[in-house]
Amino acid sequence: MKNVTDSFVSLVNWPFAGSFGLNTDILATNPINLSVVLGVLIFFGKGVLSDLLDNRKLRILNSIRNSEELQRGAIERLEKARARLRKIEIEADQFRVNGYSEIEREKFNLINSTYKTLDQLENYKNETIHFEQQRAINQVRQRVFQQALQGALGTLNSCLNKELHLRTISANIGMFGAMKEITD
């Protein structure tokens, strides 16, 4: 233990080396200090700085690659969307053309069916008119016939007396009797 205490005692007895102070001579000390500090910084900082720059460079390159991949994906999606748009536009044009031709066809069919219906109605009308004319003619004929018959009956009744009537009946009976004998 004596050795340990001797060493502390010897530290106390050391002489002081000079005083601590600032050297204000710029040309004598600062360029040397600066070159030493710069040398130490360059020697030790070069590795750290190059690692930082390499990491930054890798992150930037990865970001660029990711951006390029995203750009390629976006371009592919854009091309697909444009292709779908062109396809849909073509289909829309076809629907439009087909729709117009279908409308024209339906219009033509409707006009034709309307003309056919009008022709049928015209035929029905003409048939109805003809039927009504025939009916009217038949009614007029019946009335004329009835009036002529009534007129003839009236004339016969006024012209015939009982004696003429009996003679006509007898003559007719005789004719029927002769006819009966011929047939028997």
Curated annotation (Swiss-Prot):
GO cellular component, one term: chloroplast thylakoid membrane
Keyword Plastid: yes
Membrane protein topology class: Single-pass membrane protein
Note: In plastids the F-type ATPase is also known as CF(1)CF(0).
Subunit structure: F-type ATPases have 2 components, F(1) - the catalytic core - and F(0) - the membrane proton channel. F(1) has five subunits: alpha(3), beta(3), gamma(1), delta(1), epsilon(1). F(0) has four main subunits: a(1), b(1), b'(1) and c(10-14). The alpha and beta chains form an alternating ring which encloses part of the gamma chain. F(1) is attached to F(0) by a central stalk formed by the gamma and epsilon chains, while a peripheral stalk is formed by the delta, b and b' chains.
Family, as annotated: Belongs to the ATPase B chain family.
Protein name in UniProt: ATP synthase subunit b, chloroplastic
Organism lineage string: Eukaryota, Viridiplantae, Streptophyta, Embryophyta, Tracheophyta
